[in-house]
């Protein structure tokens, strides 16, 4: 799916970010990207911070033997932002990693934000350290990075959560929207592909059905 929009695979050693509201299909796209990496003979790290990953959905979307497939997926389910940091550090010791997925990169971060300035400063430093480690391990392993992000209200409608830090370090940013049963991916930032291109699709039982690709 993302290959259609990016005119190629997810770029290695950099961050590709997909953002959109809950229930719009971000996890489905992550699963398909994960399956693509496994087809290429690689293992995938999947950090699921929101409990969105379904083994049954992986089996539905895959054409491979599910037992063999699951051997190629390393899943972490952190329950705190500190545990998310620990999960990232474990990746340094793994082998043959083709893709690192963090589904909900700032979900736990936002849950722990409070009125205490010192605590929030600590969280911001931790987020910066996570991004640093993520890029470091991806460069070491020659891996792609795919993160999903929540949205927040802004003057222009909605924008990705996480502030300028995630915006700066994400070399590809893709907006995901939903209108009734139709979803739309729009490429907002990319170093090589054409910004503004969009892809409309439907979520079906065995995958995603592309309707059309256009530019606006």
Curated annotation (Swiss-Prot):
Source species, domain of life: Archaea
Stored InterPro entries: AAA+_ATPase, DNA_recomb/repair_Rad51_C, DNA_repair_and_recomb_RadB, P-loop_NTPase, RecA_ATP-bd
Cysteines joined through disulfide linkages: none
Keywords assigned by UniProt, alphabetized: ATP-binding, DNA damage, DNA recombination, DNA-binding, Nucleotide-binding
Pfam families referenced in this protein's UniProt entry, alphabetically: Rad51
Gene Ontology terms, MF aspect: ATP binding; ATP hydrolysis activity; ATP-dependent DNA damage sensor activity; damaged DNA binding
Keyword DNA damage: yes
Any single biological process term in GO: DNA recombination
HAMAP family associated with the record: RadB (MF_00350)
Family stated for the protein in its record: Belongs to the eukaryotic RecA-like protein family. RadB subfamily.
Function: Involved in DNA repair and in homologous recombination. May regulate the cleavage reactions of the branch-structured DNA. Has a very weak ATPase activity that is not stimulated by DNA. Binds DNA but does not promote DNA strands exchange.
Name of this protein: DNA repair and recombination protein RadB
């Amino acid at each position: 799916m993302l290959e259609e929009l990016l005119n190629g695979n997810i770029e290695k050693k950099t961050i590709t970010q997909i953002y959109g509201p809950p229930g719009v299909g971000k996890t489905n796209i992550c699963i398909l990207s994960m399956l693509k990496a496994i087809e290429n003979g690689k293992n995938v790290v999947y950090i699921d911070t929101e409990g969105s990953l379904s083994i049954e959905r992986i089996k539905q979307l895959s054409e491979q033997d599910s037992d063999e497939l699951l051997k190629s997926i390393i899943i972490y389910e952190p329950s705190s932002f500190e545990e998310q940091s620990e999960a990232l550090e474990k990746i340094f010791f793994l082998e043959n990693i083709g893709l690192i997925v963090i589904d909900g990169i700032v979900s736990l971060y936002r849950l722990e934000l409070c009125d205490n300035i010192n605590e929030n400063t600590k969280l911001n430093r931790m987020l910066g350290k996570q991004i640093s480690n993520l890029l470091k391990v991806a460069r070491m392993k020659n891996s792609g990075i795919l993160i999903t992000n929540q949205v927040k209200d802004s003057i222009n409608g909605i924008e990705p959560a996480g502030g300028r830090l995630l915006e700066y370090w994400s070399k590809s940013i893709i907006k995901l929207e939903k209108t009734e049963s139709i979803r739309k991916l729009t490429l907002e930032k990319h170093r090589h592909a054409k910004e503004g291109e969009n892809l409309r699709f439907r979520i079906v039982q065995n995958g995603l059905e592309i309707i059309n690709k256009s530019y606006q």
